[in-house]
UniProtKB/Swiss-Prot annotation:
Lineage, broadest ranks: Archaea, Methanobacteriati, Methanobacteriota, Stenosarchaea group, Halobacteria
UniProt record similarity statement: Belongs to the universal ribosomal protein uS8 family.
Name this polypeptide is given: Small ribosomal subunit protein uS8
Keyword Ligase: no
Pfam families: Ribosomal_S8 (PF00410)
Origin superkingdom: Archaea
Gene name of the encoded protein: rps8
Single GO BP term: translation
């Protein structure tokens, strides 16, 4: 099986593992973008942690789940959003105001939309989690 979109594959695997109650999930192949998105999930309290395992190829992430994710997924196509335009995408992808988080790639790195709004910067919405 080839991975056309590693972020989409990683998020669907995590979502499926959470829905059946697994405590861990392996995300392979690893990439910098997937690692940054997992860091946002960890910072926002949706996963217990993750570890990069080098297997001599692309590597993999071992993700420790905690049952806090109801749904997560990629946003395709990746929409550009200004610093004041996150509310429209919150309404579209999140079930309620201030519940869940959008993952945004900015010129300052990948972060949650709360951090981007606080910093006053825009970017592209790449994923959501709640």
């Amino acid at each position: 099986m080839t991975a056309n979109d590693p972020l989409s594959d990683a998020l669907s695997g995590i979502d499926n593992a959470e829905s059946v109650g697994h405590l861990t999930h392996t995300v392979a192949p690893a990439s910098n973008m997937v690692g940054s998105v997992l860091e946002v999930f960890y910072d926002r309290g949706y996963i217990d942690g993750f570890e990069f395992v080098d297997n001599g190829k692309a590597g993999r992430f071992e993700v420790e789940l905690k049952g806090a994710i109801n749904e997560c997924g990629p946003v395709n196509p990746r929409y550009s959003v200004g610093a004041d335009g996150f509310e429209q995408w919150e309404k579209r992808y999140l079930p309620a105001r201030d519940y869940g988080s959008l993952v945004v790639t900015t010129s300052h790195g990948i972060m949650s939309h709360y951090e981007a709004r606080e910093a006053g910067i825009g970017g592209q919405v790449i994923a959501y989690v709640y």
